[in-house]
Amino acid sequence: MEIKLEQLGYCYQKNSPFEKRALLDVNVSFDSGSYSAIIGHTGSGKSTLLQHLNALLMPTEGKITVGDREIVAGVKQKKLRDLRKKVGIVFQFPEAQLFEETVEKDICFGPMNFGVSEEDAKLRAKKVIYEVGLTEEILSRSPFELSGGQMRRVAIAGVLAMDPEVLVLDEPTAGLDPHGREEIMEMFYNLHKEKGLTTVLVTHSMEDAARYAEKIVLMKAGTVLKIGSPREIFAKPDELVDLGLSVPDVVRFQGLFERKFNVKLTKTCLTIAELTAEMAPYLAKGGA
């Protein structure tokens, strides 16, 4: 499912003394089946933008098109349930939203709220619990008896049970250790490939943006500053640092190597294998 934002703008508490501009003239598209990342410093508008993708927020200017559904600023919208079934959002610390007596009931809540029968919802719960790396026996347990990592997977299963076509991830690994973060990100990537999802990742992790995204949207102060492939975005690391962002370790090490040997490698490397191959000729002859 394709998503397109055209001249999108948003103000909190518009036409009040407390009006605050959050988004201005945002133009970006996410192709069907693509994996994109949105990066930017805190307050750049990333989370506000993502809440427009399933109409949790409505634009105050411009429009957004999700599949065949068009949402135009100032036009009253009907039947947003259909849109919200198609666009699933995993927020930061999604486990905080768990509330039911059992894992099964928690996973079934979303689908049943959108009209799925209890029987079908339970079948979905059995399916998605395996997709998030857990087993069926956990369905009868209280979510509050689980570990933090298991609770997060259960919360994610609740989103997947809606059978979305678009998956929006808002810092989905916040608070996890490096191993847990890698496991969750690999799980999302596998789901993206297996289900043909359109995936949009909001992240502060430049490593994740470089590793998984086909396209990166760089935001600053509510506007889109730059759109490009990971190689294009990280080709000028100093610009990102000036914005208060980090760069992937491989990119940082490449910069150190280029300065030390006064050389310019032929491309911006995103993996250790790429960087090793690029450095090899210089190391073989002891420097440039």
Curated annotation (Swiss-Prot):
SMART domains xref list: AAA (SM00382)
Lineage: Bacteria, Bacillati, Bacillota, Bacilli, Bacillales
Topological type in the membrane: Peripheral membrane protein
NCBIfam families: ECF_ATPase_2 (TIGR04521), PRK13634.1 (NF010155)
UniProt keywords, alphabetically: ATP-binding, Cell membrane, Membrane, Nucleotide-binding, Translocase, Transport
InterPro entries recorded: AAA+_ATPase (IPR003593), ABC_transporter-like_ATP-bd (IPR003439), ABC_transporter-like_CS (IPR017871), ABC_transpr_CbiO/EcfA_su (IPR015856), ECF_ABC_transporter_ATP-bd (IPR050095), EcfA2 (IPR030946), P-loop_NTPase (IPR027417)
Record domain ABC transporter: where: 3-246
Locations listed in the record: Cell membrane
Function summary: ATP-binding (A) component of a common energy-coupling factor (ECF) ABC-transporter complex. Unlike classic ABC transporters this ECF transporter provides the energy necessary to transport a number of different substrates.
Pfam families to which the protein is assigned, alphabetical: ABC_tran
Enzyme class: translocase
GO-annotated cellular components: ATP-binding cassette (ABC) transporter complex
The UniProt record lists the keyword Translocase: yes
MF-aspect GO terms: ATP binding; ATP hydrolysis activity; ATPase-coupled transmembrane transporter activity
E.C. designation(s): 7.-.-.-
Subunit-structure text: Forms a stable energy-coupling factor (ECF) transporter complex composed of 2 membrane-embedded substrate-binding proteins (S component), 2 ATP-binding proteins (A component) and 2 transmembrane proteins (T component).
Entry similarity comment: Belongs to the ABC transporter superfamily. Energy-coupling factor EcfA family.
Taxonomy, superkingdom: Bacteria
UniProt name for this protein: Energy-coupling factor transporter ATP-binding protein EcfA2
Main location class: membrane
Binding-site residues for ATP, renumbered to this chain: 40-47
